[in-house]
């Protein structure tokens, strides 16, 4: 069989139920439930040791399943040998055969096809991954990006019913990784490929995935589309992993806070005359409906964008969030009943200490001196309730 795309018309896809993988006393995968629909690309995202690769390897049959079920189209795969599962595998280093040319590498899994059909499939795969005419190239002459494209072509050539990719781009530099992530997404969509993809890189995950699953300590914390995951991280663990600042029950995505006006009397920057500075943006009722004060702790330049680490009052931030239209504690409580009293007065009445100043990151157009007082605005579109 030499289809140009994976046949997903009658498939129900991958089902993982209560999956556990153990290494001695270590529970690397701890009761994970996961569904991957036919034609869907699900990316598992997590730090090193989160269990994402162990989960993928268990699905592939490369790790023993301590508990739970792995099924394809409703049929258990737990006792099915690796080579009979019909799954394709691609790893970080590509694992190309250096003694074979590019065409022979891609044709490796096509031994059941006549020679002419093998050649046609190899050419088709090279076109798909953007390397037409590379059949006779020596593997040792390929760049890192070209080698990973060939590895992807080899994995796709037999039209696997499920493609498993374990950190396929992590050995490449960031610029190439960003380009290839976009290309991989296009290639998988074009072929209608069902895929489970593992990475520690958030940008890569958000580019490639239909849905992203965040893992920590062997557990799947959250699984959703990239858009909804950013809009509703769901927990402080997920929010922090995604790079959000967490202040109380608010998750602030990068860019949620911005410096919009320098307070009077801020020390001038080196080379400036005088001790006051101009506002970063005009503060008018139309452009600045609600703000809160903060103190700059440090400034840094990251990827061409100035950031200010600031100290602010979490209760003032919560009030600003409500002013900006985010649901307040009462609304978040919903049908579960009224929210517990909050605020300084409620804290004192309950014997709790009032909320202390906390740190967050704000975007700014220029560096600010440590100790400078600034005014911040909040972007509701980059802010979520937890």
Kindly give the residue locations of the regions a language model identified.
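Non-catalytic connector elements of ABC transporters
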Residues: 251-386
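ABC ATPase NBD coupling module
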Residues: 64, 75-88, 112-119, 229-233
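Short coil-to-helix segment of the ABC ATPase nucleotide-binding domain corresponding to the Q-loop/switch region
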Residues: 100-107
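Conserved ABC ATPase signature
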Residues: 138-142, 146-148
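A short, proline-enriched helix->beta-strand linker immediately N-terminal to the Walker B motif
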Residues: 157-161
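Conserved ABC ATPase "signature" region
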Residues: 76, 117-134, 185-192
């Amino acid at each position: 069989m030499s289809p140009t795309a994976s046949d997903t018309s009658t498939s129900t896809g991958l089902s993982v139920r209560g999956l556990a993988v153990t290494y001695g006393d270590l529970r690397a995968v701890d009761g994970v439930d996961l569904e991957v629909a036919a034609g869907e690309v699900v990316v598992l995202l997590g730090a090193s040791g989160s269990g994402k690769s162990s989960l993928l390897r268990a699905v592939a049959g490369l790790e023993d399943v301590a508990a739970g079920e792995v099924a394809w189209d409703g049929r258990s795969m737990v006792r099915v040998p690796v080579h009979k599962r019909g799954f394709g595998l691609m790893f970080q280093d590509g694992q190309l055969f250096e003694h074979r040319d590019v065409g022979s590498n891609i044709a490796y899994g096509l031994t059941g096809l006549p020679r002419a059909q093998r050649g046609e499939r190899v050419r088709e795969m090279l076109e798909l991954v953007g390397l037409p005419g590379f059949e006779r190239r020596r593997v040792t002459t390929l760049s890192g990006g070209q080698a990973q494209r060939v590895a992807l072509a080899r994995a796709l050539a037999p039209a696997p019913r499920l493609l498993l990719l374990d950190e396929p781009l992590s050995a490449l530099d960031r610029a190439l990784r960003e380009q290839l992530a976009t290309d991989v997404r296009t290639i998988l969509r074009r072929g209608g490929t069902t895929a489970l993809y593992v990475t520690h890189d958030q940008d890569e995950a958000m580019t490639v995935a239909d849905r992203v699953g965040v893992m920590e300590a062997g557990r799947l914390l959250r699984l959703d589309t990239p858009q909804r995951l950013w809009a509703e991280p769901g927990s402080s663990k997920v929010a922090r992993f995604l790079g959000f600042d967490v202040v109380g029950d608010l998750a602030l995505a990068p860019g949620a806070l911005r410096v919009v006006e320098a307070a009077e009397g801020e020390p001038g920057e080196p080379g400036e005359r005088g001790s006051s500075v101009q506002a970063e943006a005009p503060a008018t009722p139309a452009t600045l409906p609600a703000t809160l004060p903060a103190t700059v702790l440090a400034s840094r330049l990251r990827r061409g964008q100035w950031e200010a680490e600031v100290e602010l009052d979490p209760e003032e931030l919560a009030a600003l969030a409500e002013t900006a239209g985010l649901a307040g504690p009462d609304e978040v409580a919903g049908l579960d009943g009224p929210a517990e009293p909050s605020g300084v007065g409620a804290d004192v009445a309950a014997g709790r200490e009032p909320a202390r100043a906390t740190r967050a990151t704000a975007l700014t157009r220029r560096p600010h001196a440590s100790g400078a007082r600034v005014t911040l605005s909040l972007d509701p579109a980059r802010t979520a309730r937890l």
